[in-house]
Amino acid sequence: VTCMDVISKKQFDEFSLPYIKKLIDGTEKIMGSRPGAHICGKTSPIWSDLADAGLFSFSIDNCEDLEVAKREVGDRMRFAGNVPPIEVMKDGSIDDVIEACKDCLRKCGDNPKGYILNTGCQLPIGTPKRNVEAFIYAARKYGRGAQLGKLPKGILEG
């Protein structure tokens, strides 16, 4: 599996999608539930394919727009991610982290299939502990009262 920064949609359809479908079906058969996944980079051209393949959730890299994802396939797939791991989590301030978390919750917290606040990719080495703690603080405060299809109470109450 790879992003549209590396291969074309046609190549994805030929070389990745059939195997993604097999992995999803196999995981569901063995584990009893469908998996989630993350693909680094640009993925918007394949969101519908991933939803059609039966992916339970998809972690969106921070280079993509959560509002667009929600609008295009939010009724078919749960999303996670999108807080920038380098610009915000590693290099940003505590306030930057809190604002990025709030922004993601505002954009996708009411996704019909759900949203999991997370970073757009894994945290880089050297990410300050204070920023991880700020992320946890923001998730607890602003993600409070989360329900499918509704903005969390923490966002609504500010």
Functional labels for PLM-detected ranges:
Residues 1-158:
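Active-site loop segments of alpha/beta catalytic cores
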